[in-house]
Amino acid sequence: NNNSWNLKFSNATVNALLMLPMKASTSSPSESNMDFYSGVLLAVKDLSKEGISTDLSVYDVSGTNIPVTSDRLSASDFSIGPVNSDAVSKTLAIAPEGTYVISPLDHRTAGLAQSHSNMIQAPTSQGTQYRDLVKWLKSETHSGDKVLVISEKSAAKNASVTLMNEVISNASLSCARYSYNILEGRNAANAIAALMTKTGTNRVIINSESEAFVNDAVRNLDMLVYRKYDVVLYSPSKIRSFETIDIENLHNLKTRVSTSYFIDYESPEVRHFLMEYRALYNTEPTQFSFQGYDLAYFFIKMKSTYGKKWMENVARMGNTAMMQTDFLFRELGNGGYVNEGVRRIVYGPDYSIRIVKK
């Protein structure tokens, strides 16, 4: 078995690069990238306790200037970063095939994975999240239920809204559609009720990127819950960043969200990480600290475990749940690797927010 041979002999030092726009020498360093870096360092420290040694070189990348040569890249197993699309593209242009370039934060770099076999796209694409959400809705829909898609009337063209419409039609989801604008909001609740069932469950997608509109639609749906309609909301993850949404409404609507990032603060791993991070840095970790840790820990461990053809092995693995992200890497035809890991979370009527298993 090739894998076991690899496992025995591949425990050499992992040679990793980290390229981030930290702007360390400027008057306003990037806090998010510093947090990411702090998470990476903690992962390297934890891995050393497991007997895995890492040679980590860190570069502060400003703009699209790439501070490393092709030779330096060829001496490395992989590079985490750079972050923006142009810089990732320039790095791929000089990176030898045996050195992987991991895009850590920007889902817009996904297109580069189509044409570079050594590109690894870590953030899950919006399309993958939307497909998972619609698949989840379909799996929970029973006979007698109604599916309703609500959108904003005459809203400006938006790539995310268009993408969701494509995903819904590709999934052959039979649904009623209703669109309105906020000025008509007073009548919206009655119009939505007319499309609903009182006996089954009403499963709703609000297809809009506008916080004001989503907020209005959520309020209308919440009103219908009080009128004894059974309503479940299926939402893209952006709803979690809207500050004006009343969280209580999301719980009343038993909201389901498919997302690429969610931290379960009840988990023992997260609690341990929080204690370590506070002790080391005397501050609280941010989502960037978690992302830095998850990525560095996963890729260094995989390279150390599987040796030479490590990424081919990773692409055959099942889902790996890290602290903030799920990793499920798949190879693209002649291209590189994309992450299809999606976390499903449910807002319970008991005010819990929990991860649910697929």
PLM region spans:
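Extracytosolic ligand-binding ectodomains
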Residues: 1-358
